[in-house]
Amino acid sequence: MPMKYANLSASRISFKKWFCLPVTCLCLLVTQAQVSRYHYTTDKKAEGRSGAVVSAHPLASKVGRDILQQGGNAIDAAIATQLALAVVYPGAGNIGGGGFLIAHLANGRNIALDYREKAPAAATRDMYLDAKGNPRLDLSQDGHLAAGVPGTVAGLFASMKYAKLPFNTLVRPAIDLAEKGFAITASQAASFNAHKKEFLKLNTAPTAFVKDKEWKAGDLLVQKDLANTLKRIRDKGPAGFYEGETARLIVEEMKKGKGIISLDDLKQYEAKERTAMAFPYKKHLVITMPLPSSGGIILQQMLKMIEYRDIKNMKFQSAASVQLMTEAERRAFADRAEFLGDPDFVKVPVQQLTDSLYLAERMKDFEPGKAGNSKTTLAGTVKESEETTHLSVIDAAGNAVSVTTTLNGSYGSRTVVSGAGFLLNNEMDDFSVKPGVPNMYGAVGNEKNAIAPGKRMLSSMTPTIVLKNNKPYLVTGTPGGTTIPTSVFQTIVNMIDFGMTPGDAVNKPKFHHQWLPDELFVEKDFDAVTLQQLKAMGYKINARGDIGRVELIQVVNKKITAVADKRGDDDAKAY
C-alpha cells in the first residue's frame, strides 16, 4: 500500500450508523460527481422531493444522487450507480455479469431491458455431467467454466438511449474510485478474508482482493486494472468490452482455466428490450420483469393467489397470513420448475400461468391450519445468487428505475480476468445442469431450462415498480437468489395490505418457501409464537440468516421516502 495511505490501514471504524475517516485533506474534488472515498455516511432512510437512490453501498448511492443533482434523469443515475457498484461492491456489482432493468418513464412508457448472461456457443447440454451422468456442480459454480457471456456492459449502453448525460460523465466517478481506491467497510473486510482461499485457488494471477495481511475496515481497495477497463469502455463504448483489448484478456483468461467464452461469443452479445409485465393488484399497477426472469411471473402468481383473501385482517406475521403466503410461494415455485425457461428457446405458457382462473384452481386445495406437501402439490396443468445487488432510483420528473444485477454467487466464479480487473459470473449454474438436480440456491428445473448455446439461463431477479393513480408509488427489488421474488412479494403485501411504513416493510423479518426443499425458511428473529403455530400445522421450519436486502422508494404526495435494508451496508440518498 502506498505510504500516504498507510495510516488508513490501522484505522478502526465502527460501521453502524456512520463511516468516517479523518483524512479529508486527501479527498478529491471530481468534476460532475464529487466522491469522498475516505469519508462517507451510511443512511438507512432519506427523504426529499426531487430524487432518491438506494443501493448496496453508500458511495454508489452518493454517485447516483449526485448525478440527479447535476441534471441527470433516473436512467443516468441508475447507469452511474451500477458502474460505481462494479467498483465498490465487487461481491455482486459488476461488469462481468448481467441483469435486468425495469423503468417507468414520466411519459407513461414502461421499459424492460434484458442483459442476462448467455451460454457460450461451445456450451453443451451435459457439459457439467461426469462419465456416469452425475452432476459436477463444482464445474458449474467455480472457476472459468462456470461463466456465461457477460451482459452488463451491453445493458448499460442499451439504457443510454433514455439518458440525458454523456456516458463519459456517468462512468467518471467509477473510474476515480477504482483508480484511486476507497475505504472498505467492516463487512467487506470480513468478506474478502473469508474468500481468500477461493481467490487464490481459482485465479492464476494476483487479484486486488487478496493481500498478505488480513483486510480491516478502512483499508483502501485500489483496482487499477478495472479502472483501465472502464476507460476502454468510456473511450470505445460497448466495443471497449466486447472487442479489442478487454475481449482479448477475457479469452486469454478462459484458456487458463478451460473456460469456453470466445471472441465471437463476446462480439455477438446483445441486450434485449422486452415487453414489461404489468398487472393490477388492489387498485395498484405492478410493473415487473418478464422472462427470462422467473421473478415477474412468480410475483404475479403469488399476489393473485392471495388477492381475494382477507389477508389484511389476518394481520402481519400471524400464523394465518404466513401460511397463506407460504402456500402461494410453494405453488408458484412448483410452476417455475416445470414451465419456465428462456422464451427465445422454449415455449412458455405465460398467459395460462398468470390467468386468474388457473391461479384460483391452484389454491383450491389450500387448507387453513394445515401445511401443504410438495410431494402432492405439483406444478399446475395448462393446456399448452444469493449474491445479487439491486438499486432503486426516482427523479423529479417522475421517471422511476428498478435494476437488479448479479454475478450469481458471492463474487461469481471468484475468477478475475487477469489484466482487466473484474470478476466473472458463475451464471451457468442457473441452468438445469440435470433435470431435478438443485442448483446452489436449491432450485430445480427441467429441460426448459437446460443448457443450450446462446441461451439465457432462468433468473429469479424481480426489479419492480408499483404505480398508484398512474404515478410511481413504490420502486423496489432485492438481491437473494430464489428468495428475491418472495421478498418483493412480502414487501408489497407489507405496504399495500398491512399498511406498514417503508422502514418496517423492508426490515421486518421475512420468510421463504420455494417448493423444494419442502421447508419454510425464516429469519432468526421471526416471531416465536407464530413459529410454534406453524410447526403445529405441520411445517418444517428452517431458521437461517438474512433473507433479502430490499431497496425501497415510496412516493406519496410528491414526498419521497427512500429506505435501505438494515441487513447490509445498503444506503439511501435523497434530496
Where are the language model's segments positioned?
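Alpha-helical support elements that line or immediately flank enzyme active sites
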Residues: L68, A154-Y162, K236, G240-E243, ...
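Active-site Gly/Thr loop motif
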Residues: I261-K282, L357-K383, L424-P463
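Extended C-terminal subregions enriched in glycine
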Residues: K455, D497-G545
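Active-site rim segments in enzyme catalytic domains, especially the processed small/beta chain
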Residues: V87-A112, I260-S262, A400-K468, F498, ...
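Internal maturation/activation junctions in enzymes
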Residues: Y308-L407, G419-A420, P435-G436, V444, ...
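Bacterial Sec-dependent N-terminal signal peptides
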Residues: M1-S36
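Noncatalytic scaffold domains of N-terminal-nucleophile
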Residues: Q34-K62, A74-I75, I79-K236, F241-E243, ...
